[in-house]
Amino acid sequence: MTIHKKQNIGVFGFGKTGISVYEELQSKCNIIAYDDLEVNRNKFEELFSKNYIIPISDIKWQNLDKIVLSPGIPLTHEIVKIAKNFNIPITSDIDLFFEKSKGLNLLAVTGTNGKSTTTALISHILSDNGLDYPVAGNIGVPVLQAKASKGGYVLELSSFQLDLVKTFAAKIAVLLNITPDHLDRHENMEGYITAKSKIFDRMDKDSYGIINIDNDYCHEIFTNLQQKHHIKLIPFSVTKILEKGISIVNDIITDNFFEHISFKLISNKSLQGIHNSENIAASYAVARIIGLEPVKIIESISSFQGLPHRMQYLGNIDDINFYNDSKASNAIAAVQSIKALDNIYWLAGGIAKEGGIEEIKPYFSKIKKAYFYGQAKEMFANTAKDIIDFVICDDLKQAFELAYKDACKDNEKEKNILLAPCCSSYDQFKNFEERGELFIRLYNTLNLCL
């Protein structure tokens, strides 16, 4: 879906993606643009000009050659209906990026959980071994703003982005896991699975699909692709040793795909837990395809420092480990970090998600004491009552201070203070990043005082 200079293009959505699309196309074609939110339109006007902002009620939207849609726009939106009624092709920033990146290795990662960590880990392993593969996509850097690379890119792709792709084809595609998510967008689980599986569309016989077969939904996709014989498939598992695939069991990585070898993983506090074993297995497979030796890959994995706010290990003070998992905004995500640790002083709170912390109850035995704050504190207290020790706090700062005070009295050899909120942050913070930054500042202040 090539963009030509004389074409009339509509850009809908002024988030990071929409802005990157406009910047990419403004000198190449005639553009009109719009966003439903006034605050976004004002931002666009400050950056560029209000002359390009045309409401979708204007007839100009009916006479376009293409519409570039931002991934956050639901496919039930009026702009999509206009495109269908007037036979206007809808495209995306991912497809535009694909057009300009021919000849480069495009590595794509998707999954309900672990996408960002895996994307960053792959890039780290390759960079650590002299290969330039910048990250881009859903990880925070729009693909059209990715820094130049002579080798390739590691792209994190969400189901929203995959929903829109029509020409993009990865050289290596990773599917980490699928659990119910974004069902408001995809209508049902089948729609969500279909979107995720699009990461394997249009791949050729020399391309690789790397899939977690421990996950039932992913295993079904693996089986379907296996029957088509159109790409090379590498299964991975963290529950069993595969006869042909990549496995991680008890911190031993077994490579029975490229050659029959096993290695002990070097301990890395930024990559603890079964969920991170999935991320490591997938990243290892990618690096092997690229041509790296196993020993080099294992060494690079050990030096990965993790991503901010995703089970981020901050350090140890007074035999207490501090972990920032502010990104864990629901119980399913928080379970992963709780499962990875013991003797936990757990900080949780904010605006509760559906189900609260019910999913965590089977793992309450790992929690020494909980510190609940924010709007959810009473709800969480009711769930925890008579099962674990807890205290209700005014805010995250008080929760941190009380947790540290209690952990200092604990004579256990290793204690862990974990921020895994199980909530959205909007009652006290702008976003999960701001929440995590406060936790980091509290840790740093404590460290300076010692």
From Swiss-Prot:
What reaction does this catalyse? UDP-N-acetyl-alpha-D-muramoyl-L-alanine + D-glutamate + ATP = UDP-N-acetyl-alpha-D-muramoyl-L-alanyl-D-glutamate + ADP + phosphate + H(+)
Subcellular location field: Cytoplasm
Q: Which Gene3D superfamilies match?
A: Mur ligase, C-terminal domain, Mur-like, catalytic domain, NAD(P)-binding Rossmann-like Domain
Keyword hit for Nucleotide-binding? yes
| The protein's name | UDP-N-acetylmuramoylalanine--D-glutamate ligase
Q: Name one GO cellular component term.
A: cytoplasm
The entry marks the following residues as binding ATP, namely G111, T112, N113, G114, K115, S116, T117
Q: Which residues form a coiled coil?
A: none
* Gene behind this protein: murD
GO terms (BP aspect) = cell division; cell wall organization; peptidoglycan biosynthetic process; regulation of cell shape
The EC category is ligase
Q: Which family does it belong to?
A: Belongs to the MurCDEF family.
Q: Which cysteines are joined by disulfide bonds?
A: none
Q: What's in the keyword line of the UniProt record?
A: ATP-binding, Cell cycle, Cell division, Cell shape, Cell wall biogenesis/degradation, Cytoplasm, Ligase, Nucleotide-binding, Peptidoglycan synthesis
| Species | Rickettsia bellii (strain RML369-C)
In short, the EC number is 6.3.2.9
Its predominant location is cytoplasm
From the UniProt record, give the pathway where this protein acts.
Answer: Cell wall biogenesis; peptidoglycan biosynthesis
Q: Which InterPro entries match?
A: Folylpolyglutamate_synth_CS, Mur-like_cat_sf, Mur_ligase_C, Mur_ligase_C_dom_sf, Mur_ligase_cen, MurD
- Can the keyword Ligase be found in this entry's annotation? yes
What this chain does, per the record?
Cell wall formation. Catalyzes the addition of glutamate to the nucleotide precursor UDP-N-acetylmuramoyl-L-alanine (UMA).
